[in-house]
Every structure is written in C-alpha cells, then in structure tokens.
Amino acid sequence: MEHPIPAGPLAVRWVGYELEPPQAGALGRARVVFDNAGSASWRGLNVSYHWLDDRGNPIVWDGLRFEVHAEPGERVDRELDVRGPIPPGRYRLAFDLVDEQRFWLAELGNFTPELDVDVAPRDASAARTFLPPDAELDPDWQERVNAAHTDGYSAVGGSIDVRRRAEELEPYAPNGGRNPAFAHPLVCPSLLPPLEPNIEVAGLPAWRPEGDEPWIYDARIRLRL
C-alpha cells in the first residue's frame, strides 16, 4: 500500500488490512498491519476506526480501541473487533491511530486507509423472546421486532398495555415510536444471543442495557397484559 508518510515523531505506514463481511450492529473482526514510521516510540496509542458515509461524514466516529506499542521501524500486526454501524447499507470504513484526549494521527497529516463496505442486515434467526404466557401481541409485533434486529439491535423492547394499573409499568405506556434514549430496562424483550434478561420489572423478565450492545425501545411494538 503506497502512500505519503509525514516527517516527524509520530508517523504510520499502513501495509494492509482485512475485514470480515460486517453485519449491522454486530461484532466482527478485522486485521490491520502497519509500521511505526516515525522517530518516537509508541506508548499509549490505540488503533481504532471510523464509519463514514459516502461523503466522508462521520456516522460512528469513536470505534472500539485497541492499544498498540511499537518502537521506531517496528511492524504491528493486530486483530481488531469492529462493530458494524446501524442501519445496514453502504459505508466507508477508515482506520486510524489515536492518542486519547489529544489527537488522531490523521490530524498530524498521516494517511488514513478507507475502504468501501456493504454492511449486511443483522442475522436475527437466533432471537429469543421473553414473554409471560398471558401476553397478547399486536399483529405486527413480530414483524417490528425482526425489523429492529435486522437493523442491527441486539436487544429490542416495546410498550405494554396493562389491564390493571401497575406503577412500575407506567413508563411503558403505548405512545410514541422508537426511543434510543429510553431510560428504563426493556421489559419482555427480544434478545440476540448471548444476551439474557438481567433484571425483573413488576415480576416480568427485563434487560437493562449493559456494555456496548446496541438496543432500541419502540413503543409501536406493543403487547397487552
């Protein structure tokens, strides 16, 4: 891979990269190979990535981080976890090195390799729903759940229409649409492996968001109890 290399203490020469076919929202693998082409040792640098649209605008700027150490002239061969962007579609994937809270090496004039990537819908075939026996689902409940999973969400929850008032379930009243900032656990969720319910709300199985697993609450996904 031929590209210009800036003079200075922090410079990188990209040698190559490989990427597993990504799915929206799912963890995949990549492999990057690069050299420390500068005069300074690398300490406290991380290799990461950006997901961009076709005009170079950031969709996901802060990818997962992986620490790298290298002396001047040393080669790094590193496997990375890469989480696919949401929703599926055509993106650009850019790799870069970052000195946290200071700068990305691209800001110092370093080359950033970019590749055009088709991000596939997420495989939702293994999704599991956690519902009580007396739950009545709206006719489009399963269709909406599947659509959210294939968009890339590991955990999907919706609204609950209760026959008897239950204070704990008031935040789940059926109104609105998708809410990525929903402040409560997902009750009676649909989860992709390896996720499992990790809490109960009003005696019902629920999942409280944890880690970086993508999730969505959609009030249009409605069930009755």
Locations of the language-model features?
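Conserved donor NDP-sugar-binding/catalytic core segment of glycosyltransferases
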Residues: 140-171
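Asparagine-centered strand-capping/turn motif at beta-strand->loop junctions
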Residues: 34-38
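Short beta-strand-to-loop acidic/aromatic patch adjacent to the donor-nucleotide binding site
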Residues: 126-136
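Low-complexity, acidic Ser/Thr/Pro/Gly-rich terminal tails and inter-domain linkers that flank the onset
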Residues: 2-24, 114
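Beta-sandwich strand segments
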Residues: 101-112
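A recurrent flexible, glycine/aromatic-enriched loop bordering the glycosyltransferase active site
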Residues: 174-194, 198-205, 211-225
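Short, surface-exposed loop/turn segments at beta-strand-coil junctions that are enriched for proline
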Residues: 83-89
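Short beta-strand and strand-turn-strand segments in soluble, beta-rich domains
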Residues: 11-14, 46-66, 109
